[in-house]
């Protein structure tokens, strides 16, 4: 069966990084292929005996984007193993990346009005509007806090895991950096006792045994984990029936170092029977409170 990966998302969110990783992993990759050629390209790839292809799609042809859901349906009807990944990032992060690269946004001309040139923020806002229908199609990865190496690792894990009906991901995050855009379910554990205020535990993370032992000693912590566990087990079958391929459960505390990391590790242990299961920790910085 031909494996097809479509990479789409906001310009500057890391599509080129993702495509290079796939190319290094043995995929035949095409960047910025016009959407009207996608079905034909996949058919030819299949006829030529290719096993893995990846295509990056952006908004250079915005008029075609409305057809992407139909194209995705057609590709699946062809019997391909299809994965669609949508990359996103905060507007501030995108603006910073454009400033560092000094690249021109692909929608600059389209967003401009008359003689007034559009600002970068205007271009990003227009692109979000154009891509909004696609964002809910498949798996979303928020690259705001990710290094290129982390993004490559996340894409590799996702592609390796994307063989089952539903990929379950648990990730911890820091509220001080904002709720990740790729979260389907969000649980706030800032109400739990905070190991940060114990000087011996402050430099550690929720993956370290002393922190785990400290948090495990509080009944309220165990009740919180039990409640999250029960909610997910109650509704996971329904998410699967909804033809969803991915479910990302995000758990946040103030700094993303102690409480959220511990809760995610405990949830991952409890759901270890689910295959595939991914665990991600967005922030584990020893100098920031959790």
Curated annotation (Swiss-Prot):
Residue sites binding GTP per the record: 58-61
Matching InterPro entries: P-loop_NTPase (IPR027417), RapZ-like (IPR005337), RapZ-like_N (IPR053930), RapZ_C (IPR053931)
Membrane-spanning ranges: none
An example Gene Ontology molecular-function term: GTP binding
Gene3D superfamilies: P-loop containing nucleotide triphosphate hydrolases
Annotated keywords: ATP-binding, GTP-binding, Nucleotide-binding
The keyword Nucleotide-binding is assigned to this record: yes
This protein's record includes keyword Acyltransferase: no
Binding site for ATP: 9-16
Role played: Displays ATPase and GTPase activities.
Family to which the UniProt record says this protein belongs: Belongs to the RapZ-like family.
Protein name (database record): Nucleotide-binding protein BAV3158
Biological source species: Bordetella avium (strain 197N)
């Amino acid at each position: 069966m031909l494996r097809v990966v479509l990479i789409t998302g906001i310009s500057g969110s890391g599509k080129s990084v993702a495509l290079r990783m796939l190319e290094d992993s043995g995929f035949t990759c095409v960047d910025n292929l016009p959407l009207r050629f996608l079905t034909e390209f996949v058919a030819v790839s299949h006829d030529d005996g290719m096993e893995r292809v990846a295509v990056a799609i952006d908004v250079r042809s915005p008029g075609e984007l409305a057809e992407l859901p139909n194209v995705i349906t057609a590709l699946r009807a062809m019997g391909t193993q299809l994965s669609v990944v949508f990359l996103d990032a905060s507007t501030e992060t995108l603006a910073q990346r454009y400033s560092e690269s000094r690249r021109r946004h692909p929608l600059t001309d389209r967003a401009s009005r008359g003689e007034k040139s559009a600002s970068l923020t205007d271009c990003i806002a227009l692109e979000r509007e154009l891509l909004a229908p696609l964002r809910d199609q498949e798996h979303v990865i928020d690259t705001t806090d990710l290094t290129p190496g982390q993004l490559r690792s996340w894409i590799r894990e996702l592609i390796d895991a994307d063989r089952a009906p539903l990929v379950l991901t648990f990730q911890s995050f820091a509220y001080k950096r904002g709720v990740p855009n790729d979260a389907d379910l969000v649980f706030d554990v800032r109400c739990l006792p905070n190991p940060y205020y114990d000087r011996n535990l402050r430099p550690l993370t929720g993956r370290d045994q002393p922190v785990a032992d400290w948090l495990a000693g509080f009944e309220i912590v165990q009740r919180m984990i039990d409640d999250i566990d029960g909610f997910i087990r109650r509704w996971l079958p329904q998410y699967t029936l909804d033809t969803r391929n991915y479910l990302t459960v995000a758990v946040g505390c103030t700094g993303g170092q102690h409480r959220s990391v511990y809760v995610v590790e405990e949830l991952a242990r409890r759901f270890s029977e689910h295959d595939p299961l991914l665990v991600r920790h967005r922030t584990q910085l020893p100098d920031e409170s959790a």
